[in-house]
């Protein structure tokens, strides 16, 4: 070989791809088998086992609630009924009450035309250092102007009064600006709710609330959304274009898939798990999302799912109750993933290999979010919320103090449902027995070929003489007594008790058999108002436990990540579900009465155009009319007032805004001095003035 020549090794594309895969596999193995990841997985398994065992009694209650709504007996009770024989009828009282409660809550919270929440300014907006300096500058300008006009310095009392006047005027303008920001923030959140599936999730949440010991909703959670966009092609035609964007979404969490830490009362008190049954499409959608391990997801898609975290027996029973039959034969592969939200001690994180920069204080607890699927950790990050809040909100139809799980309607009226079922079964059995006679046949007097198992009209009975010479009939008929009236009385009594125990009276969903005051329209209105007290407590639970925290989290999300600075400000979330519970027709009448009563010059001077416009907006919204198209916005009104106010709004006293000095007058009001002072008039005493 000649000197100075070198040999280059040529590597094929397949070889390069193989080397890249091997390098990626080594990096994935090192990452997944690191001391930190192994420690996290071990800790999560211990927490999961405790939460799964503690959830078992609640799962039994929820399965019983599903059967109760579906009109099915418990397996042991159904076996006893079949052993005894007779009717297996099931009266659907629970289903009727649950549907009525759902309809009532949806009418209050979803069908009012306005969202059950509002964004308002705080009573006293916080002043930033820059705004404080603006107030000081305005006060200095006032002092300088007074020195120019009055040629004297202000006293201490005048300084304090002037400073307070400047601050009040500034705060008033600040409140107006904050209200404009609040309106824009409200529109922004309403748009995010519409695109993020809030209405659908909240609708399912209400069904869970009426049925199970707790209902849970999740959000905002940042996910990839596939939307349809429109653009012009080369020929100028409008064509569809699929778009992918990252945006907040909301979802109803199945109570069967939520596992809280044993012994906690609220979600914020401890850790929790959510079980995710993921299809391949749902799992692949996580690729490219912030915080997820793309290589682990791709490896999982290649290998398939081999670990089941949940109780398969409970899963199959639940799916059958939901009329999802033979799901084990489903060809689509389902991956069982667990999502963990909770605290991990800094000491454990240090022991698992995290540095002092990542974990400054080992004595503190750090909020973490971890996804585990199969043998892989898909995501392990610290909680992105500045206060460590978890993206869940839950409440119950009836809350039990100190307990995480409350009670749903099926659990509340379970005993009543059982009594009504027993009365209905006895009634049906008694009706069957008493529907015809009991037949007694003397076999000694019946020919051998006579069929005594059938009875029908006009049947001819062949009999022989009684060998003993008795005159008794060979065939005797006995009519059993009917107890239908007594059994119906028992059923009616206990079905009325279901109204009282559930707080959902029958006349709310169209029962016309109302006695007493309910026979008149005003009396029925009073009864419905009284019945509203029971549901008001449930609505207050939804307001405080679900609507306010969810909307507040969306507000914080927009404050942190939205680029539009015009929506940001010192604002607060006000839930309005309990307010919507009031009779809307009565409220609309009262609003219109107030609108007419305030249509006079005195009230107009007090309210001003802004106040009148605010009143018109509320009336238009309550009538489900387009308020923004009927009443101009605050900015439009302000521009119109400035445009028309020009000279009319100039300060009195001529140019410069100087106040004209008052003209000296006599005690009777006439002017002193000048041309008017030279006019002689007669005063009240008859003398000249």
Where do the PLM segments sit?
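Short coil/turn segments at secondary-structure boundaries
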Residues: 200-208, 219-222, 431-443, 508-515, ...
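Short, charged/polar micro-motifs that form catalytic or ligand-binding hotspots
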Residues: 171-175, 179, 192, 196, ...
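Long, highly charged low-complexity segments enriched in Glu/Asp and Lys/Arg with interspersed Ser/Thr
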Residues: 608-653
């Amino acid at each position: 070989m000649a000197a100075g020549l070198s040999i280059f090794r040529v590597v094929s594309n397949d070889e390069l791809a193989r080397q890249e895969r091997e390098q990626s596999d080594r990096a994935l193995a090192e990452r997944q088998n690191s001391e930190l990841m192994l420690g996290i997985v071990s800790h999560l398994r211990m927490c999961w086992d405790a939460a799964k065992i503690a959830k078992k009694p609640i799962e039994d209650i929820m399965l019983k609630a599903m059967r109760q709504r579906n009109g099915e007996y418990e397996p042991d009770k159904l076996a006893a009924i079949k052993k005894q024989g007779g009717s297996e009828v099931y009266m659907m009282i629970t289903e009727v009450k649950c549907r009525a409660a759902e309809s009532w809550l949806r009418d209050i919270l979803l069908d009012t035309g306005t969202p059950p929440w509002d964004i308002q300014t705080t009573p006293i907006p916080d002043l930033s250092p820059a705004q404080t300096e603006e107030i000081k500058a305005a006060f200095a300008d006032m002092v300088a102007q007074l020195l120019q006009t009055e040629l004297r310095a202000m006293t201490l009392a005048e300084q304090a009064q002037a400073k307070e006047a400047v601050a009040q005027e500034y705060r008033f303008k600040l409140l107006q600006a904050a209200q404009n920001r609040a309106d824009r923030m409200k529109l922004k959140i309403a748009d995010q709710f519409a695109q993020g599936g809030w209405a659908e999730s909240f609708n399912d949440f209400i069904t869970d609330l009426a049925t199970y010991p707790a209902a849970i909703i999740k959000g905002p959670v940042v996910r990839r959304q596939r939307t349809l966009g429109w653009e012009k092609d080369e020929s100028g035609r409008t064509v569809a274009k699929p778009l992918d964007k990252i945006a907040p979404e909301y979802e109803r969490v199945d109570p069967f898939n939520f596992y809280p830490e044993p012994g906690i009362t609220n979600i914020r008190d401890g850790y929790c798990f959510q079980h995710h049954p993921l299809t391949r499409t749902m799992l692949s959608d996580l690729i490219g999302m912030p915080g997820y391990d793309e290589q682990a997801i791709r490896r999982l898609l290649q290998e398939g799912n081999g670990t089941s975290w949940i109780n398969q027996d409970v899963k199959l029973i639940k799916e059958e109750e939901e009329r999802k039959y033979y799901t084990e034969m489903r060809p689509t592969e389902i991956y069982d993933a667990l999502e963990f939200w909770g605290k991990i001690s800094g000491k454990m994180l240090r022991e698992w290999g995290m540095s002092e920069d990542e974990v400054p204080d080992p004595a503190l607890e750090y909020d973490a979010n971890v996804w585990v699927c199969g043998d892989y950790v898909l995501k392990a990050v610290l909680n992105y919320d500045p206060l460590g809040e978890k993206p869940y909100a839950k409440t119950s139809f009836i809350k039990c103090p100190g307990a995480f799980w409350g009670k749903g309607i099926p659990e509340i009226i379970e005993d009543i449902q059982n009594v009504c079922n027993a009365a209905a079964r006895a009634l049906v059995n008694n009706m069957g027995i008493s529907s015809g006679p009991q037949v007694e046949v003397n076999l000694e007097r019946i020919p051998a070929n006579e069929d005594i198992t059938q009875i029908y009209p006009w049947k001819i009975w062949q009999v022989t003489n009684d060998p003993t010479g008795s005159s008794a009939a060979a065939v005797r008929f006995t009519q059993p007594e009917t107890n239908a009236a007594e059994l119906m009385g028992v059923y009616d009594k206990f079905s009325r008790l279901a109204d009282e125990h559930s707080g959902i009276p029958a006349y709310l969903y169209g029962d016309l058999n109302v006695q007493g005051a309910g026979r008149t329209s005003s009396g029925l209105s009073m009864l419905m108002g009284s019945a509203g007290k029971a549901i008001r407590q449930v609505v207050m639970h939804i307001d405080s436990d679900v609507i306010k925290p969810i909307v507040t989290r969306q507000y914080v999300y927009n404050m942190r990540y939205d680029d539009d600075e015009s929506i940001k400000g010192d604002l607060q979330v006000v839930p309005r579900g309990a307010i919507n519970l009031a009779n809307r027709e009565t409220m609309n009448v009262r609003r219109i009465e107030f609108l007419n009563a305030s249509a006079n010059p005195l009230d107009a001077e007090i309210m001003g155009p802004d106040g009148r416009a605010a009143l018109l907006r509320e009336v238009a919204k309550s009538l489900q009319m387009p308020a923004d198209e009927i009443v101009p916005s605050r900015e439009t009104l302000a521009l119109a007032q400035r445009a028309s106010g020009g000279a009319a709004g100039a300060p009195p006293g001529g140019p410069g805004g100087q106040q004209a000095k008052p003209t000296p007058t006599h005690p009777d009001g006439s002017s002193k001095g000048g041309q008017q002072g030279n006019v002689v008039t007669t005063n009240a005493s008859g003398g000249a003035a």
